Amino acid sequence: MSMLEVNDINTYYGKSHIIQGLSLKVEEGEAVALLGRNGVGKTTTIRSIIGFTPPKTGDILFKGKQIARRKPEFISRMGMGLVPQGRRVFPNLTVKENLTMAARGAAKGGWSLEEIYRYFPRLKEREKNMGNQLSGGEQMMLAIGRGLMINPELLLLDEPSDGLAPMVLHDIANIVMQLQKKGLSILLVEQNIKMALKIASRAYVLNKGQVAWEGPSEDLRNNEELQQQLLVVSA
């Protein structure tokens, strides 16, 4: 049984048909990348899965159970975490308060502050600082920490590299890989192709709301012509 199975979903914004018959899978303990140019439907796919913009048709199975058109709160309690695009930490709460507030949605167990701080020692150092006092990299660490506090079995990451310096990007990528090795399933939306293919073992490339290519990350990494065709923005 797959951790996540998306079958032929169609998602609309008003009358605009954004996601068109999209299917994908994430196996237990697997990291999968969702790639594509801006505006091809990557974030809408994430929003469809987590329940913010439910698909009109199609099935989404999480741990074998139908979640298409269920409320985000229900899906979260089942064990699906989200690190949203733009990080969206609470600016007027401390690091510690941001984390403990996220833990309220945990269905079972949840991560402890000590576990979060073990992965992100910088957050321990900054635990009394407000969210708006953190650097972009620290905010991303906090956003991932918030996503982990509900003890997810699947973590959705939407553009974690956005606006981060290369050194910080390296650290974030290593942490995500550590989480995957710990057994966490990951679906990663990312514009940074190199980072995404380093983390994920498989990839899907979207174009106009549909899957244009899928396969092992190594195949895409070694195919510059395909990258130019589907991923690189023309000048």
Residue ranges and their predicted role:
Residues S2-A235:
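Glycine-rich phosphate-binding loops of nucleotide-dependent enzymes
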